[in-house]
Amino acid sequence: MVRTPCCKEEGIKKGAWTPEEDQKLIAYLHLHGEGGWRTLPEKAGLKRCGKSCRLRWANYLRPDIKRGEFSPEEDDTIIKLHALKGNKWAAIATSLAGRTDNEIKNYWNTNLKKRLKQKGIDAITHKPINSTGQTGFEPKVNKPVYSSGSARLLNRVASKYAVELNRDLLTGIISGNSTVAEDSQNSGDVDSPTSTLLNKMAATSVLINTTTTYSGFSDNCSFTDEFNEFFNNEEISDIYTTVDNFGFMEELKSILSYGDASAGVIENSPEVNVADAMEFIDSWNEDDNMVGVFV
């Protein structure tokens, strides 16, 4: 439904009110009281819209309107009520005697809102403004990629170079539990799980188990060449750059290069992914009798 206009547009005066118009409106309301705003202009001898007469009286001419600066108590009341009711100025005005909704709205927009912002408080939610702004969203924190990057790299290395790999050791690599976790707690060192794994790998000849050259390996391609080619592989390089602790990579390289330079590789060893690592573990040796120390 469309609301009918309160008065006809023809002959209606707009703009600022004159003192004479104010006096006519005041005199009429003193005699007849408030109400009947649609017919009031004609009865009071005003060429104004009924709505304009009502707002002029409510916001400027009403005798109980409180003038002057807002007190600190009024400021606190407005802020508290705004936090509860939002921009419902008429509802807020009922709690501040003598203050009009229009005056409160203007005072909020020109003073209180800016004051709250200076104190680091959001004028809409009335909560502290986050360091990222007023959106309330926190920046995404990049999760450490050390564990996943290391696991993927070790799987790649194991699948290419290993002949025998201890089942418990690989389980520790993938899940980070059992002995590895206990060693980490005992040592108190952030990198102790990695160091423990590397020591155990070195002692049990995990990564380079034999110096025998396999038939699928060409005579003119040495272990060193394969080693360098492996670490220069684009995918391995990507993993390398995502690992936080580069000391881990250096230790791993030193283990891979440890021993006879003629150490061979398995030509068609399957690639191991973290997702299906447990299936890959089952095919490996379960012997874990040697204890090594990697300095």
Swiss-Prot record:
InterPro entries: Homeodomain-like_sf, Myb_dom, Myb_TF_plants, SANT/Myb
Function: Transcription factor involved in tryptophan gene activation and in indole-3-acetic acid (IAA) and indolic glucosinolates (IG) biosynthesis. Acts as a direct transcriptional activator of both Trp synthesis genes and Trp secondary metabolism genes.
Location relative to the cell: Nucleus
GO biological process: cellular response to sulfur starvation; defense response to insect; indole glucosinolate biosynthetic process; L-tryptophan biosynthetic process; positive regulation of DNA-templated transcription
CDD domains assigned: SANT
Primary subcellular site in the record, as a coarse category: nucleus
GO molecular function, one term: transcription cis-regulatory region binding
The organism of origin for this protein: Arabidopsis thaliana (Mouse-ear cress)
SUPFAM superfamilies, A to Z: Homeodomain-like
HTH myb-type domain: residues covered: 9-61, 62-116
DNA-binding positions: 37-61, 89-112
Tissue: Expressed in trichomes.
UniProt protein name: Transcription factor MYB34
Highest taxon of source: Eukaryota
One GO cellular component term: nucleus
Induction details: Up-regulated by herbivory.
Subunit structure, as described in the record: Can form complexes with MYC2, MYC3 or MYC4.
Keywords, sorted A to Z: Activator, DNA-binding, Nucleus, Repeat, Transcription, Transcription regulation
Gene3D superfamilies reported for this sequence: Homeodomain-like (1.10.10.60)
Disruption phenotype: No visible phenotype. Reduced indolic glucosinolate levels in adult leaves and loss of responses to brassinosteroids.
TM annotation in the entry: none
A matching Pfam family: Myb_DNA-binding
